[in-house]
Amino acid sequence: MKTKLILSALLFSTFTFFGCNNEQPNYTGYWKGEADMIFEVFTENNIDYTIRNVNGDLTARYEDNALRGKNSLNMDILMRVKGDSAYYEFGEDESGKIVTGYMRISKDEYDRIFKAQTDAKASYN
């Protein structure tokens, strides 16, 4: 009986310890999705964020466990992070929403892809 009580207390304390993590996910860094879609996220205060890609910057704010803002079409955007995976959502209207997945990448990989995209954009214009 004593062993069962000790094991129960240990199990309960483990669930309490791991279940009460209120830390904000790490949004900052470099992200890559399908077809080399990349963006960088940075902040100075862990509340207001900048999301940058080859097309420019978006601003977002940390609210309700996600980054929230507007895209260049004035549509609501939302970004959630789980470990080294990011999920970017937009287009919540009658047509539904679009969710795209991204993985964390290194600065070197980001810089290489960003340069290639910038060069391609410049030659297109």
Where are these predicted regions, by residue range?
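Edge beta-strand at a domain terminus
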Residues: 92-125
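Sec-dependent N-terminal signal peptides
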Residues: 6-11
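N-terminal glycine/threonine-rich, aromatic-flanked beta-hairpin/loop signature
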Residues: 37-72
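C-terminal motif of bacterial Sec signal peptides marking the signal peptidase cleavage site
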Residues: 16-19
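Tryptophan-anchored aromatic micro-motifs
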Residues: 25-38
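Positively charged n-region of N-terminal signal peptides that target proteins for export
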Residues: 1-5
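Bacterial signal peptide processing site
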Residues: 21-23
